[in-house]
Amino acid sequence: AKTPGNPRIVMALDGYGTNNKNNGFIFGGDLHGHLANYDVTLVAPISGDYAAGTYYTDYASPLDNGKTIRWETFLVQELPHYLSQYFRVPVRPHSTALVGLSMGSVGIMNLAQRFPERYSAVDSMSGFYTLSAPAQASSLAMGSALMGYRPRAMWGAWPSSQWKAHDPALNIRRY
């Protein structure tokens, strides 16, 4: 941000096409160049192999290797405090805009719906928005499995209450 202590943030979450060296919004989409004249802090986690197939959510149960996926916890609780402590970006309600691509779209839609007091805007591109539809739920589960994750570890067996709680179409009124 141009102004020190400015709480305005744009957080960009990648899709499957990301890698471990950079965020696709920066190196593939020049988001930092687009936002250069705006007084905002760009937060674009390099998620790569760490996120591909996770949909930036907290998994309901550990994976077979004992690993627990907690992207939502990181993005909502840990990252804001890290930014505050190390970059002097204050934690304020309605001060973060979310942008997501593909898998990142599912993540940002859920963040915005589950924590509406935190986020001011959402730009979601090419995601799964109706997880109550068998085809979209199957595609999401297949994407997770292709990346080596156990889809049932995410939100349980489809169509559980957790799947419904993370369905952007069913939860549209939360915005």
Where are these regions (language model features)?
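Non-catalytic cap/lid and distal C-terminal segments of serine-dependent acyl enzymes
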Residues: A1-Y175
